[in-house]
A protein has these predicted regions:
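Glycine-rich FAD pyrophosphate-binding loop
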Residues: 188-206
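Active-site- and interface-proximal helix/loop "cap" or "latch" segments in soluble metabolic
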Residues: 41-143
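N-terminal secretory signal peptides and thylakoid transit peptides that target proteins
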Residues: 1-20, 24-28
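Conserved redox-cofactor binding core of oxidoreductases
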Residues: 206, 251-354, 375-376, 435-437, ...
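An anion/pyrophosphate-binding glycine-rich loop and adjacent beta-alpha core
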Residues: 403-405, 412-553
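A glycine-rich dinucleotide-binding beta-alpha-beta segment and adjacent secondary-structure elements
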Residues: 333, 558-644
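N-terminal Rossmann-like FAD-binding beta1-loop-alpha1 element of flavoenzymes
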Residues: 170-194
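Glycine-rich loop(s) and the adjacent beta-strand/alpha-helix scaffold that form part
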Residues: 351-354, 358-431, 648, 654-663
Length: 672
């Protein structure tokens, strides 16, 4: 293992690393963040020529190419094409103009594209340094893993490289959903804590939270059958869970959601919304013909019409109580003493790359997210889920660094994949499931879809393979049809419906976030369809024959497709799915023009395969013994899900995340 010295840590050989990612990419928890060496000044003497710098953006390697005369910048090309289309990718022209006008890397950036802007600044800084003849740094990343070894090796950092020390009682790593909720609870209790986050802002809020017998249920007189719920969670996981961990969520989530309410409603006036009754369940008719499911009334969200986001309000909450987040500070490694207790971490500034020791007297909580943005981990830990995925709706910064850091310290990773796959990965005809090569994406691979989620894809319309054949009962939880497609050509499938799409969706009555298709009305569904049509992924035709052509069906496959639609109409007329047993209320006619068709695979939201924990939220080692001083929550925690995500329990993952965030703080602070 190579030691990283203060002067030499940036000069690690790049052969095993990904090009375009810098040593500053020891993400606070799992994202890559880039860095260059010397700071470049505004004015000065340059060596005429063209220079290129790269840095990691939110989801890709950003490239800046600058041309210099002996005294000025004469041309700038900014390539952010791999960033989020409507944000970072769209900001390239404005960032280019800012660099030209400033004549330096000291620019304002573009609002809403902070991470991309920061990457452009760092890449530009490298160009200026090269033009001035100053030392520049080869872009490398400390341990990335690779295509055969996703884990890699823990960095060995010289004491001399650590130039700052911070002492605290509780350290929270990651300012996402779990980390910010833990911080809010700790702030409310007046505890001594710090939060670090590798990005420059809090991370995206997942708005739907699952809580058992919370205030909404109490107001409606609803009482959960907790034993049945425990059994159902275990059934989803095929028994590959720790039921004591599940019970912590079941028994303590009511207190969690009450604390959420106290901040959202009482403090900031944002109304909480509880979903219950028929709205929370599939129609009873489903059980007459199909395997039935449990539909626990656990879902809470809040009024977002004002633009409120929970994580941003939690940041405001802790700031008002005198706390804050150490942004642009990333996890490098955990530290432990001779007794094996986790005593803190070594972190790294993503601004100037100096190392910081955080001593945590009472414990460390890792709340770092999963690994959906890391193709090395996805392909090696979940080859099946990867193979059926066509689009992504995850946070690109979730690259599994927190999981890897915990494992380097001796923690035990769940052995079963548990991806959160939604059947909404819309793509153009001819596109297969799985990664495609990408010069700008982390690891050189990306999923091909350009739309994060096509929500109508969850509706149980007719679905066929590339041969035009129906192959499954389409009335199922979100991930069932995408796994069924793993056995079909290209691992994708086509969805077909007619002009009555909204009327059919209302009758289908799907639940959870897929209910947006029916509850959003014509304006919502038309917006989703227009977006997909513009992207060349959804087709609208006056005849089924024309639709078949647009969808790419030819020869025998086209004949089979048209025959399959005719057969499906017969089954609708009979109100009896003789072929696959779909409940009658979820059959639909395909007779009224215009007709719509698209190709779908999975949209990957996150991964739930994480570090094994006990009912207190403590990380477990490879002997399943608690690791003193280390707690885990969120998507990087395990012991709860396996194989899939129970999407008919809306909000269960976020409920688990917030419950164990609160639990960990209680444990570390000695509050229970």
């Amino acid at each position: 293992m190579n030691k990283i010295s203060r002067k030499g840590f940036l000069k690690i050989a790049a052969a095993a690393a990904m090009s375009g990612v810098t040593a500053g990419a020891l993400a606070a928890c799992n994202a890559a963040s880039s860095s260059t060496a010397a700071s470049a000044g505004a004015a000065g003497s340059y060596t005429p020529g063209t220079y290129t710098g790269t840095a990691e953006g939110i989801s890709s390697t950003v490239k800046v190419t600058m041309t210099f005369s002996d005294s000025a910048v004469t041309d700038v090309v900014v390539d952010t094409s791999g960033e989020t289309a409507s944000y970072g990718a769209a900001a390239a022209e404005e960032l280019k103009n800012q660099l030209l006008n400033a004549g330096s890397d000291e620019i304002d950036g573009v609002s809403g594209s902070t991470i991309t802007s920061d990457a452009v600044k760092k890449a530009a800084k490298s160009c200026f340094a090269q033009a001035k003849g100053e030392a520049t740094v080869t872009s490398v990343q400390l341990p990335t893993g690779d295509e055969t070894d996703w884990l890699g090796k823990e960095p060995d950092i010289d004491e001399a490289a650590i130039t700052e020390t911070v002492d605290t009682d509780i350290l929270i790593v990651g300012a996402g959903n779990g980390g910010m909720f833990a911080a809010a609870y700790a702030a409310a209790k007046g505890l001594n804590f710090r939060v670090i986050e590798q990005n420059g802002n809090v991370q995206d809020t997942r708005h739907w939270v699952g809580a058992v017998d919370g205030f909404g249920a109490q107001e409606q007189g609803i009482k959960m059958d907790r034993a049945k719920l425990l059994s159902e969670v275990s059934r989803y996981a095929s028994g590959k869970c720790d039921q004591r961990v599940v019970k912590t969520w079941i028994n303590e989530s009511a207190e969690m959601i009450e604390f959420v309410r106290s901040i959202m409603e009482d403090k900031y006036g944002v109304k909480m919304i509880y979903t219950y009754g028929d709205e929370a369940k599939w129609p009873a008719e489903n059980a007459e013909h199909n395997t039935d499911y449990m539909y626990p009334e656990i879902e809470y969200t809040y009024d977002r019409s004002s633009g409120a986001a929970r994580n941003e309000l939690l940041l405001q909450y802790i700031q008002e109580l005198g706390y804050d987040v150490d942004f642009k500070t990333s996890l490098a490694k955990l530290e432990k003493n001779s007794d094996g207790r986790i005593t803190g971490i070594i972190a790294q500034s993503t601004e100037d790359d100096h190392f910081i020791r955080y001593n945590a007297n009472k414990g460390v909580l890792l709340a770092c997210g999963g690994f959906p943005g890391n193709p090395y981990m996805m392909e090696q830990l979940d080859p099946l889920g990867t193979s059926v995925t066509t689009a992504c709706s995850y946070s690109p910064s979730d690259k599994g660094y927190g999981i890897r850091a915990a494992m380097w310290a001796g923690a035990n990773l769940d052995k079963e994949a548990a991806p959160m796959l939604f059947d909404r990965g819309i793509v153009a005809p001819g596109v297969d499931g799985g990664y495609v090569d990408s010069d700008t994406a982390f690891g050189g691979k990306a999923f091909p879809g350009t739309i994060r989620q096509y929500n109508p894809g969850t509706q149980p319309f007719l679905k066929v393979n590339r041969n035009g054949e129906r192959f499954a009962n389409e009335s199922s939880p979100y991930n069932d049809i995408v796994y069924a497609a793993a056995h079909q050509p290209g691992r994708v499938y086509a969805q077909i419906c007619d002009a009555n799409i909204l009327e059919d969706a209302k009758r289908f009555h799907t639940i959870g976030c897929s209910a947006q298709t029916r509850n959003g009305g014509e304006k919502y569904i038309q917006g989703k369809m227009d977006e997909a049509i513009e992207a060349g992924a959804l087709f609208k035709c006056d005849t089924l024959d024309a639709l078949a052509d647009k969808m790419g069906f030819t020869g025998a496959a086209k004949d089979t497709f048209l025959a399959t639609v005719e057969r499906y109409n017969e089954l609708y007329d009979k109100q009896n799915d003789e072929d696959f047993g779909k409940p009658a209320y979820r059959l639909s006619a395909i007779r009224t023009a215009p007709f719509y068709g698209c190709w779908l695979g999975a949209s990957l939201l996150t991964t739930e395969q994480g570090i094994a924990i006990n009912e207190k939220g403590q990380a477990l080692d490879n002997d399943n013994k608690p690791m003193p001083g280390l707690y885990i929550t969120g998507d990087m925690s395990g012991s709860f899900f396996a194989n899939n995500y129970p999407c008919l329990m809306a909000g269960v993952a976020m409920g688990r995340t917030l419950t164990f965030a609160m639990k960990a703080v209680k444990q570390m602070a000695g509050l229970e």
